[in-house]
Each structure stands twice: as C-alpha cells, then as structure tokens.
C-alpha cells in the first residue's frame, strides 16, 4: 500500500490534490443500515471550512460534499461509500515562482526526491486541503459511534504559539474561531493580527477527547489502540508530536501516582489517557497534539532550487498562519475513524465475550 488508506476493517482511502478538480475519499467497511445524508457530513465539514475568519486562509471553498455511492434511500448499503468535494477557488498562478524551488519546512523537497516529480500548486498532495475528506469520513464514523455506544468526540486549542490557553469550559469552544475553551479570545486575535503583519506563522497545541468509549477496543503489541491513534494523528499535516494521557509528563511522575487506582466506584485518575496495554479502559481517551508553524509564509527565506543552487523563497498564495486553528475537527475525525475501526475489529473477534462483572465507572471524581 502507498500510504493513502487509514484503517483495517473501516478503511478510508483519501484522494486528490489541493488544486485538482476535486478531492475525496472512499470508505470501505461501513456496516449497512445506518441512516446517512449529505447534511450529516456537511455539518462537520463546515466546522473545518476555510475562509471562515481573518485568522485562517482566505481561500473560499464551500466544501460541499457529494455522496456518490454506498447509500440508498438514506441508508448505508454496506458497499464502499464514495465522497466527493469539488475544488472551486484555486489560484495556481500564485505558485509559479516556487515551481522550481523548495519551501523550507515544507514537503516540496522530500516529495521531489521521492517521486521525481511534484505538483507545486498549493502543495499538491501534501496540502492541508486533503484533510477535508478526512473530516467527511470522520463524520460517518462519528455518527456510527454515537448511535452504537454514545461516544462523544471533542477537541480544543490549549496553546497558540507561545501563548498558553487556560481551560475554562468546553461550552466556549464552538463560539470562537480558535476552538479555544475560553470566553474572551481578544488576546489571541491580537496575537494573530500581529503575526500576519509580520509575515510569519506559529504552531499550536490541541487537546482531543473521546468520551463513553467502551472497554476492550485495541489489540496487543503493534495494533494497540494508542499506537493507532498516534499513527493517525501524525498523518495530520504539521503534527510533530502526540501524547496519550499524561504523555511526557509521565517521566516526572512516580509509580505511586502515575498508576490509575481502580476502586469499586471507578478509576481514581486518568494518567493512562483511557488506554492500558493498548486496550481501552472505558475512561475518556485523552490525546494532545503539537502542531508546527505553517511553512508557507511571505517572509523571504534561504533555500535551493531543483538544480541545487541557492535561492530565496517567498511564498505567495493564501495560507493558514496557524494550521492548528482549524485542526480541532480534523483531529476529532481521525480519532473517530480509529475508534470505529477498532470497534468493528473487536466485534469480529471478541463480540461473544461476556464478563460476569460489569466494567467499573470511568471516574468517580
């Protein structure tokens, strides 16, 4: 496989380029009989859509999804679901000046050396534009998980550049362009305005959470649930680090505090992030992502061209000054895809397993 498919039973194959006629995905393995309409998918795509605030790319794509197959009379048929999103606002001429050179920090250099050819328009296959089909597929997984288990997925930004964002409430997240869990985002708006004027970009940190995940999802060793979550999240453009639960903070913890005590009332903590031995505990799945600064910026930078000669690169076009601002719905989608895939795998192998004692509560705190 050439790395364009995520999942084993619930498998999502992504296709297209940033400035091609369309992008999309094919979902294989979705169970039959689930109610599904384009509106279910569109609601999630609208959360990720570009051009929604002055702090993201001004490329104005409607991201209208079309269901081409796999749904009949409003229900999934069990056959592959093909989803299409047409590109309508490309400006390929903006990239003519970098067609023969490489943007520092971008995939231009590695794509060219790997394939011997690259599409410079909007980053081609390496563009964050390709996260739209991921969100579309995630919407399908999200609906199935909610109906089957009551799983809820959510994400928020916890850091913008060097500015840490305190957690106030999940209720604030849908009401500001940063997906920030705070009521007042004026400080972050000013920060982004100054960044744009300086012709620069910044990174971000995100928190991603899944609630009501059943006990038992995940496989031992190489297909651990947390391993597959990390694998999926690293497929999100610009992600450079993934933590599960306490993550790297575990280094400074001791066994007496890191291990989540089990009581008849529930778990006393969740340093494990909802996964033990690669298998879900029934607690909240907690994931944290580190996202690097956008590599496409208007500030001049030193680089080389395809002939190995020194050159100066200035990126034109329309770009997100912080990829992390629109990453929350993408991260939720990736987590949904992984969870649905593992839920179907678990059902196939262990669906008949019945425990005499019910699982303990996720938490009694």
UniProtKB/Swiss-Prot annotation:
InterPro entries cross-referenced by the UniProt entry: Chorismate_synth, Chorismate_synth_AroC_sf, Chorismate_synthase_CS
Residues where NADP(+) binds: 48, 54
Pfam families: Chorismate_synt
Stretches assigned to coiled coil: none
Keyword DNA repair in annotation: no
Recorded metabolic or biological pathway in which this protein acts: Metabolic intermediate biosynthesis; chorismate biosynthesis; chorismate from D-erythrose 4-phosphate and phosphoenolpyruvate: step 7/7
Keyword annotations from UniProtKB, A to Z: Amino-acid biosynthesis, Aromatic amino acid biosynthesis, FAD, Flavoprotein, FMN, Lyase, NADP
Lyase is among the record's keywords: yes
Family to which the UniProt record says this protein belongs: Belongs to the chorismate synthase family.
HAMAP family in alphabetical order: Chorismate_synth (MF_00300)
Listed name of the protein: Chorismate synthase
Source species: Paracidovorax citrulli (strain AAC00-1)
């Amino acid at each position: 496989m050439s790395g364009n498919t995520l999942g084993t039973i619930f498998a999502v194959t992504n296709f297209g380029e940033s400035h091609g006629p369309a992008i999309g995905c094919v979902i294989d393995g979705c169970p039959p009989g689930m109610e599904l309409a384009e509106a279910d998918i569109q609601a999630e795509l609208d959360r990720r859509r570009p051009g929604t605030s002055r702090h993201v790319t001004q490329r104005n794509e409607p991201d209208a999804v079309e269901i081409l197959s796999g749904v009949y009379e409003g229900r999934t048929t069990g056959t592959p679901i093909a989803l299409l999103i047409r590109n309508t606002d490309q400006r390929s001429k903006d990239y003519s000046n970098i067609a023969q050179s490489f943007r520092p920090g971008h995939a231009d250099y590695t794509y060219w050396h790997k394939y011997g050819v690259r599409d410079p328009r909007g980053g081609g296959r390496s563009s964050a534009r390709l996260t739209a089909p991921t969100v579309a597929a995630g919407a399908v997984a999200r609906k199935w998980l909610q109906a089957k288990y009551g799983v809820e997925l959510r994400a928020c930004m916890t850091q913008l550049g060097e500015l840490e964002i305190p957690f106030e409430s999940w209720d604030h997240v849908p009401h500001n362009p940063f997906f920030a869990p705070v009521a007042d985002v004026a400080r972050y708006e000013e920060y982004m305005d100054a960044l744009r004027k300086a012709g620069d970009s910044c990174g971000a940190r995100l928190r991603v959470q899944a609630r009501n995940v059943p006990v038992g999802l995940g496989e031992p060793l190489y297909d651990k649930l947390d391993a597959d979550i990390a694998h999926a999240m690293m497929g999100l453009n610009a992600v450079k680090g993934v933590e599960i639960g306490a993550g790297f903070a575990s280094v400074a913890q001791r066994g007496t505090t890191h291990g989540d005590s089990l009581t008849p009332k529930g778990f006393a903590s969740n340093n494990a992030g909802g996964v033990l031995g690669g298998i879900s505990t029934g607690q909240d799945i907690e994931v944290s992502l580190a996202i690097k600064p956008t590599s496409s910026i208007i500030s001049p930078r030193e680089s080389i061209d395809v002939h190995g000669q020194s050159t100066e690169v200035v990126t034109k076009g329309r770009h997100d000054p912080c990829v992390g601002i629109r990453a929350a719905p993408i991260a939720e989608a990736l987590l949904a895809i992984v969870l649905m895939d593992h839920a179907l795998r678990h059902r196939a192998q262990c669906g008949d397993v019945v425990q005499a004692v019910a699982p303990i509560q996720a938490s009694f705190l």
